Amino acid sequence: KRFIVTEEVYDEFTEKFVKAMADIKLGDPFAEDSDLGPMARADLRETLHDQVKDSVEKGATIRCGGEIPDMQGAYYPSTVLTDVAPGQPAYDDELFGPVASVIRAKDDDDAMRIANDSRYGLGGGIFSRNEDRAIELACNHFDTGMVRINGFGIAAPNMPFGGVKDSGFGREHGGFGMKEFVNVKAVFVY
């Protein structure tokens, strides 16, 4: 996932985020002391690792993780990349695995430009102390199907779920979602 962070808080955020990600314990998902289990398949892990390596070859920096561990199973550690830029898979593509791309933005407007500079648009999030500004950015500047402000979570059954651009067509869930699965018919009686 892409974490677009404004200049004003970038260094502090990145330092704390890298520490938190580095502290995630990889292991058996049934073990109580494990935080992160394996990926679904080894080929998916290989694809993810290739995307990380390609991003690094093109200028990204690994701040934690980024190496396939010597463990049985399709494990991949929580990984943070910085110095992420256009032309790198970590910027341009969806990375399906525990990899976070931290991207520096000058300000809110630059953050929105970067966020929208993607062929995908399923969802996004804005974390801000200024909730009114976050709502304004979400409603008027963020080109995604869903936006969460100051939080994250799974799909809510009463809210439409779906994206824009290459992230799908239509909606599921809620009233809008129900309309995706029915045909509207006009009946005229004279």
Language model features: what each stretch is:
Residues 25-26, 68, 75-190:
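Conserved C-terminal structural/oligomerization subdomain of aldehyde/semialdehyde dehydrogenase
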